[in-house]
Amino acid sequence: MSRSRAWPSFVAALVVLALGALVAVGVGQALGLSYEPADTPPAAVSAVDLDPLVPAPAIATIDVPAGEQVALAASAVSDALTTRGLPAPTVGVGTGDADLTVSLVPPFTDSAEAYRVRTAGRLVLEASETAGAAAGLYALADRIRSGAALPADGAAVEPRLGLRLVDSGSVGREADPAAFATGTDYSLNTDVVAGAVLPEAPWVDQDVVDEIDAQFRQLVQHALRHGYNGVVVPGFLEYVTFSGVGDGHEVYPEGDPHVARAEAMVEAFGPVFAYAQDMGMHVYLLTDMLAVSPPLEAYLERTVGGLDVDDPALWSVYQAGLSELFESMPFVDGLMVRVGEGGAVYQAGWDFSSRLAVTSQSSVQAMLNALLETASAHDREIIFRTWTVGVGAVGDLHTNPKSYEAVLGGIDDPHLIVSTKYTMGDFYSHLPLNPTLETGSHRRIVEFQARREFEGFGALPNDLVADEAQALQQFLAANPHVEGVWNWTQDGGPLRAGPMTLYLRTGFWQMYDLNTYGTARLAWDPDLEPSQVTGDWVRQTLSSDPATSTEITEALARSREAITRGLYIQPFAEQTVKALGLEPPPMMWIFEWDIVTGDSAALDSIYEVSRDGLDVAIADGAGAAEVSAGMREQVASTSPDTWHSPELYRSFVDALDYETDLLGTLAAYRETVLRHAEWLDTGSATAHDQWRAAEQDYRAARAAHVERYSGDLDLPAYLFTAADLGSDRADRDPAMAWAARGLLLAVVVVLVLGFTSARLPGAAALRALVVAATRPWRLGDVPAPTTRADRVLVWALPAVVLVLSRCVYTWFAAPAHLVATLGAWLVLAGVLRWVVRGRDPFHLWAALGGVVLLRTVILLVALVVRGPGRYWFGFWTDPAARTAYITVAFAAFCWLFVVVALVLRRAYGLGTTRSLGATLVAGGTALAVVAGGVAVIGLERALTIWNDQMALLPWGLSRILGITVHLGIPPSSAGVLAVVGIVVAAVGVALALAGRRAPDLTVAATRL
């Protein structure tokens, strides 16, 4: 009889184990930590051997052709001469003999920017077009400022890359100390003109427009002097009325303020941006797609049925808007489009946003074909950015040549330019060069970032000239279609989470102006010696003293070593890693920008990848700090009197002090987390002692760093909140391991006592719990006790074990996890108690308590090794252990419902159908309540609270785009689960009612 009653339970056990195995495999595939060596290029090295300073040419008079463009370029020569201590020359038009004469001659190359300088006798600069005359004057000014020799006599000079773009710099951005002081504003909007927008007529604040105009002119003039010939300005929908759609009022009805505002914007900002074209620069507007406004979205809903980005009818609306833009702003050379990120600009009178909708191969092609048709009709260009960053089916378009060819290979249009970041990912170090830039037949431009967002936001010395030279040389050798660069002087990353440096305007912006200068010089001639380019910039920006400029240039030559060793854990950084279905960046331990992470997912994975080179990885941190200290000593040894200003000297030395302090702090933290992970992995006493010693160093260094730099707008302290959360939990691992051992021993003692016939108070309760945990099909045979001690102990003991074990599991630091876990148990128990209302609940409590003890034993076995830290270390890094644990743990979770159904049937006689129904009601209600609570709170907020307390995933996820966005979790998931719970409960109610109306088949068969 006993065997016949047991075999269904054995079958159920096999089924739940199989389910557990399936879940374990699915989790393993979702996590999928894998890595392989990345094709990281060797470190670019450029020996410092600067050319000697050359005396500035004696130029007292300059004769130039008529025109503002050339006159502005001539003023650059004048300023260069005065910088070298010479009198400002007289600039005239058609004055005849002059010390420097600019002449327009017949073409001698294919480039409109070509020029040549004749140095026999008086200087003569020859060019075939105004663009060449201006380019030649800017180049002469640069040579004079740098103390460099002039071009060879009569040699034609033309740019290797004909399109050299900059972003809009800091134009339109406010140096707001209060906004920057918080250091936690991770908003990514880069709009230029929003500060001038008014909520009502006249729609724009002319005083703000004038300020933006002055800032834009400053940017244009500086960029021209560096050698750029184009600028990219955010904007599209704010200048469009869609007057070309239907009768002109279909998108924006008559009287809609969008129309008057757009017209006012064109009138106000058209002349501002046209200045760039007047001075010889290309002007491109930049937009995300799909760009929308509420009326536009409503119109598309009415006419196209929504945001159907494959429908030509949708794109015809944008074609009309683009055509209007080209007509109302004729100086605009084209539109730059990005589809991989989106967002909104929300403020008074401003309601434009974008949707991540163009995510398939067909939709990208439909968009480009439509926009190119309009651009071709107006002889303009479309620049398509391949920055798709994992979005949709085109998520790897940015880095995968096969995807690039599949999406773009069929588009052949001379008006299309494809723009791509130079690295195989974002602007990090240690990444391979982007292979898609070596393929394809389209016109290509290469994107660079001067103010490296992930490497201190430009606050740290970071000479990228040699790296960029290496990249350009490789791309040009492989792809003849590379024809330009786009340098980000200010853009990239959050606007106000780093130092308050605004390009050309606020803070020590000169630190990253080096890279802006270097990119332009290399775009003209990629074969230049990088250290000489850096030296030229140093001489004209910081110091022209030969000894001082050499010391500074040599220090900058070491800057990449300090950055690449100090901000990266090299064994990890030089691997191509995949985890959680994503490709983590090479700087996961700082996630992102200035957030030093403390989560186990990142840190344990970094250790796993770096395990074989652990000592080197740790030594790199201290080595980087030593390099920075050496740079500081080298620069500080120069005399401030030899610099162009003492303020520049002080700013540079302060930056090196900051870097040395930061890298030293990070070095101590690096050793702390890696040695902790080593201890979790091996249990080594040596690793434990090294972890503890490093942690003491880290806490002292961190406190000093925060005290010194907290509130410093120029050199802000890094954010260690996440690191502290992780360190606090790591510190508790040894104690939690001992607590788990003690609790496990107590549970084992309880189980042993339950197996014996010992006559102790509560013995009946212990026997019932043991039977429920090991042979639940026999629980109905256990007699109900007669003592109050047994009736209390049968539920109180499992409750205490449940609470204590989950407290240990969460380091006594995650009440959110306890609320969710204990809440689910309470709801389940409450519903089941209602089901057996009017009856003795002893067997029900025994059933639930037995499963609690069983599941707790499984959990504690995983915790006794080295606490929750080791539990999660195995989860992230050990596929075999993870699979085994999840299989058993999930099976035990499912086993709960098997046991509940058994006890309802065997102990309370509910019958098969009613027992199943009641079990579904209890389980569904618990799911609905917990998931519903999460939905009410908000899934993103709930996950943030939980993750902040558990420190499992990067703390920065929720501070930037959100955990749900990063991991692709639909925000409605909690609500959907709540509905599922309600449906399950409803099915359970139906089954329970059906079971009451009809005799159970098994019982009926027994009666026959």
How does the language model describe each region?
Residues S2-V16:
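N-terminal Sec-pathway targeting helices
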Residues G20-L123, S128-A131, A148-A155:
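Acidic, contiguous N-terminal accessory segments
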Residues A38, F180-S187, G484, T489-D728:
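C-terminal non-catalytic alpha-helical accessory regions
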Residues S46, A73-A76, A80, T109-S111, ...:
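Feature activates predominantly on carbohydrate-active enzymes
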Residues T82, G169, N229, V259, ...:
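Catalytic-core regions of glycoside hydrolase
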Residues M736-A758, V979-A986:
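Selective detector of the "anchor" transmembrane alpha-helix that sits immediately C-terminal
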Residues G762-H843, L848-V852:
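Selected alpha-helical membrane-embedding segments in polytopic membrane proteins
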Residues A829-W946, P954-G975, A992:
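Hydrophobic alpha-helical transmembrane segments and adjacent short intramembrane/lumenal linkers
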